[in-house]
Amino acid sequence: MIQTQSMLDVADNSGARRVMCIKVLGGSHRRYAGIGDIIKVTVKEAIPRGKVKKGQVMTAVVVRTRHGVRRADGSIIRFDGNAAVLLNNKQEPIGTRIFGPVTRELRSEKFMKIVSLAPEVL
């Protein structure tokens, strides 16, 4: 569960390393975001010569959470940390590589590109 002020790792090669959630999109008083939800983030830590710079405000999709996601069969998939993938204005990933596993819940029309780039889909 990601909320405002939550810090997330970046799971792509866009140049950002850490981002902070500044808004959960979808609803006027929505408090939490889970896997597959879109959030507004600001870049807190970036590498030199990356595609994004520190202080930039971006949109991102949550790909891993410590809270996890419950499947229909009752199983829960949890991760060691929270991670997101940065998106451009057309909701496409900025980076060309995805690091770490992602869940099957991202297999919607919007995020098939992220699933195809990921090394492992759980």
From Swiss-Prot:
Q: One GO term of the cellular component aspect? A: cytosolic large ribosomal subunit
Report the superkingdom from the record.
Bacteria
State the UniProt keywords alphabetically.
Ribonucleoprotein, Ribosomal protein, RNA-binding, rRNA-binding
Share an example GO biological-process annotation for this protein. Answer: translation
Q: GO: which molecular function terms?
A: large ribosomal subunit rRNA binding; structural constituent of ribosome
Q: Tell whether Membrane is among the UniProt keywords.
A: no
Which SMART domains does the record match to this protein?
Ribosomal_L14 (SM01374)
SUPFAM superfamilies (alphabetical)? Ribosomal protein L14
> Its family?
Belongs to the universal ribosomal protein uL14 family.
- Reported function: Binds to 23S rRNA. Forms part of two intersubunit bridges in the 70S ribosome.
Complex formation: Part of the 50S ribosomal subunit. Forms a cluster with proteins L3 and L19. In the 70S ribosome, L14 and L19 interact and together make contacts with the 16S rRNA in bridges B5 and B8.
Which protein is depicted? Large ribosomal subunit protein uL14
Source species: Ectopseudomonas mendocina (strain ymp) (Pseudomonas mendocina)
In the UniProt record, the gene name given for this protein reads: rplN
